[in-house]
Amino acid sequence: MAETLLSFGVEKLWDLLVRESDRFQGVKKQFNELRSDLNKLRCFLEDADAKKHQSAMVSNTVKEVKEIVYDTEDIIETFLRKKQLGRTRGMKKRIKEFACVLPDRRKIAIDMEGLSKRIAKKDKRNMRQTFSNNNESVLVGLEENVKKLVGHLVEVEDSSQVVSITGMGGIGKTTLARQVFNHETVKSHFAQLAWVCVSQQFTRKYVWQTILRKVGPEYIKLEMTEDELQEKLFRLLGTRKALIVLDDIWREEDWDMIEPIFPLGKGWKVLLTSRNEGVALRANPNGFIFKPDCLTPEESWTIFRRIVFPGENTTEYKVDEKMEELGKQMIKHCGGLPLALKVLGGLLVVHFTLDEWKRIYGNIKSHIVGGTSFNDKNMSSVYHILHLSFEELPIYLKHCFLYLAQFPEDFTIDLEKLSYYWAAEGMPRPRYYDGATIRKVGDGYIEELVKRNMVISERDARTRRFETCHLHDIVREVCLKAEEENLIETENSKSPSKPRRLVVKGGDKTDMEGKLKNPKLRSLLFIEELGGYRGFEVWFTRLQLMRVLDLHGVEFGGELPSSIGLLIHLRYLSLYRAKASHLPSSMQNLKMLLYLNLCVQESCYIYIPNFLKEMLELKYLSLPLRMDDKVKLELGNLVNLEKLENFSTEHGGVGDLQFMTRLRALSIYIRGRLNMKTLSSSLSKLRDLENLTICYYPMYAPMSGIEGLVLDCDQLKHLNLRIYMPRLPDEQHFPWHLRNISLAECCLKEDPMPILEKLLQLNEVSLSHQSFCGKRMVCSDGGFPQLQKLDLCGLEEWEEWIVEEGSMPRLHKLTIRNDPKLKELPDGLKFITSLKEVHVILNNWDFKKKLSRGGEDYYKVQHIPLVRFL
């Protein structure tokens, strides 16, 4: 596993040396020797990669070589970065620093010679050894199981308040629970639904908070102690009909910790999943426990065939006899477990020839004969399949997949951030971008991993892309092999070695401080808010090789330590929700940053010196929502930006935007007077812009010249407007290909529908928070031909809605929320046969009564599968 990863690292380092060879004057001899030695490493790793399973000596050697590669990269980049900083400083400083140049050259010469000696030592002792050749969503039968479980949850006569699914890992417990959770009968029966991934290292407070966000969203922003959470949830679950899914509970005592929020004999139900049947018995000794069976050989073949031949799912299609024979031999090693079948299918779906199948079948047998370090006897064959699937990944995907091991179990990973983590660590090499954005490359990698069933993710309905992902716990065990190889470490890791990456999730600050004494640390991620801590001045001084630094929620109080300017290798820096009031001017040294998030806590007014103009490599920039009045930013130099958030006209010039021609996403906050034609002119230069948000402050204040706003952006698909205006601009002011539009706080006095319905590509429309202040709204025949989702929320003056026959013929989901004066749903809904879901959230009992079965308006919604009242 590490051999391939290292080959990737050596190739990346080789590219760096070739690209920058002209900049090593004064150390040419040592440079050329080092480059020659690296070539030896490449040859060694190619040989080692082929025979990694049979030799402990090879494994140990690879670990030592890995340290050499990392140290080489650190030395080379430090030398190059110092030279670059020298070029960008004034003449006086350059003359003053000239005396340091020769010592720097002597130091790198000595460092290079030391590295060459280390490589030579490896070459002499280990690399000459030879290695012996060794040639060694798709579901079946789920419907009945889902129906059975749904029945136990919704039937009135079933008194079991806890329903359980138990069985070994990979048998499909979570998949089954997810199907039940999303079942239309369940959605219509329960007023609130909550899903919680419990995991081995859960905290009770986290579980309770997650449940509260779903069953009592009005309390989300309230800070509560555990006792307060327990009391609030106990009351809510005593009055509301809710389904809580507790996925992956490990121990009986874990249930005991969570259980106090559930009052006896009320309308709530729990669906839990666990590998441990004892958990189910502890939760409800007399409750219904469902145990999925392993798949039969016939069912296994059906699943496998559907995955590997996705376009040929007909009984008439004939699979090549020899491939079918090989396939049936391979699936025997999956043990009837759906997870293993999906992963094996994901592996073979990208291989099309009989010879490739024979090779993979030989590798499966080789793994089982040769063995790996997995010790679970009951599932050893399954682990071998998963391990082989990893090894069959392309090199670039292996590196990116192993990176996921550092995140906690069941942690939901944000894919935009992950794309930048990968880029900051140089995992996709420069040629992979070839003009594509960092996010697009990351999306492509995730799509590959999803296709191979190595990660779990679902496309977002609005953006049509993967936004988050996570690992199945068994797949994560394969991924965690990386920790043994000293590549990463999580906060709870027991590894005595010094890793290059560290993830911190709350925890003991004393223990964390000990781990931060490692000067070779390259990546530090805080994934929970840490609270007050005063040790960062020392950390920044010590951790000068850092590439990725995510300081989510860290409380600095006042000024960020100036020593952060020493982290000259940083490519990723996030201060999201951190607490700070001043950024130091030393941050101007962070010229290699690709990603910079300065969106600190909203309560903080922060001062930012005018150093952002020097960060020419930036691809992502998120500015604070509140900045000191003295802040003036020049951003016109940031021509590589792909995403700019929270740009304020109070602190920056709109004219700077026209130079950011690579922008895909932009949010603008307009404060004070602004010429709309100037803004439109700048936006017209952004030919690749896909997502635009424009907000005007103060809210509900008239804005002059709004009729001059023309959004002439060729690629614009998503538009969010929070601008006070009595009337929408005419439809020709909007891009014809706009897919989503969201309006809020506009106070439109004229009905916006006659304009919006002429934007023929609209897929989703949201009108919220007083976006419309009129009384009557009409959707006419032929309007909104592509619309699938419509949200009408917080329209306090709206009384009447007319929908003509032929309007919104593809509408799938409708939400009506907090529209207190709306008298009734329109008669025309009965013509929209595509409607699948209607959600009505109103404090109006008569409204619900009329739409319920037997009510006078029931005919309007009787064709809709799911109608929910909250």
Curated annotation (Swiss-Prot):
<dbReference type="InterPro" id="IPR041118">
    <property type="entry name" value="Rx_N"/>
</dbReference>
<feature type="repeat" description="LRR 4">
    <location>
        <begin position="735"/>
        <end position="758"/>
    </location>
</feature>
<feature type="domain" description="NB-ARC">
    <location>
        <begin position="123"/>
        <end position="432"/>
    </location>
</feature>
<keyword id="KW-0067">ATP-binding</keyword>
<dbReference type="InterPro" id="IPR038005">
    <property type="entry name" value="RX-like_CC"/>
</dbReference>
<keyword id="KW-0433">Leucine-rich repeat</keyword>
<comment type="function">
    <text>Probable disease resistance protein.</text>
</comment>
<feature type="repeat" description="LRR 3">
    <location>
        <begin position="703"/>
        <end position="726"/>
    </location>
</feature>
<dbReference type="InterPro" id="IPR036388">
    <property type="entry name" value="WH-like_DNA-bd_sf"/>
</dbReference>
<dbReference type="InterPro" id="IPR055414">
    <property type="entry name" value="LRR_R13L4/SHOC2-like"/>
</dbReference>
<keyword id="KW-0677">Repeat</keyword>
<dbReference type="GO" id="GO:0043531">
    <property type="term" value="F:ADP binding"/>
</dbReference>
<dbReference type="GO" id="GO:0098542">
    <property type="term" value="P:defense response to other organism"/>
</dbReference>
<dbReference type="GO" id="GO:0005524">
    <property type="term" value="F:ATP binding"/>
</dbReference>
<keyword id="KW-0611">Plant defense</keyword>
<dbReference type="Pfam" id="PF18052">
    <property type="entry name" value="Rx_N"/>
</dbReference>
<dbReference type="InterPro" id="IPR002182">
    <property type="entry name" value="NB-ARC"/>
</dbReference>
<dbReference type="InterPro" id="IPR042197">
    <property type="entry name" value="Apaf_helical"/>
</dbReference>
<feature type="repeat" description="LRR 2">
    <location>
        <begin position="568"/>
        <end position="590"/>
    </location>
</feature>
<dbReference type="InterPro" id="IPR027417">
    <property type="entry name" value="P-loop_NTPase"/>
</dbReference>
<dbReference type="Pfam" id="PF23559">
    <property type="entry name" value="WH_DRP"/>
</dbReference>
<comment type="similarity">
    <text>Belongs to the disease resistance NB-LRR family.</text>
</comment>
<feature type="repeat" description="LRR 5">
    <location>
        <begin position="759"/>
        <end position="786"/>
    </location>
</feature>
<protein>
    <recommendedName>
        <fullName>Probable disease resistance protein At1g59620</fullName>
    </recommendedName>
</protein>
<feature type="repeat" description="LRR 6">
    <location>
        <begin position="808"/>
        <end position="833"/>
    </location>
</feature>
<keyword id="KW-0547">Nucleotide-binding</keyword>
<dbReference type="Pfam" id="PF00931">
    <property type="entry name" value="NB-ARC"/>
</dbReference>
<feature type="binding site">
    <location>
        <begin position="167"/>
        <end position="174"/>
    </location>
    <ligand>
        <name>ATP</name>
    </ligand>
</feature>
<dbReference type="Pfam" id="PF23598">
    <property type="entry name" value="LRR_14"/>
</dbReference>
<dbReference type="InterPro" id="IPR032675">
    <property type="entry name" value="LRR_dom_sf"/>
</dbReference>
<feature type="repeat" description="LRR 1">
    <location>
        <begin position="543"/>
        <end position="567"/>
    </location>
</feature>
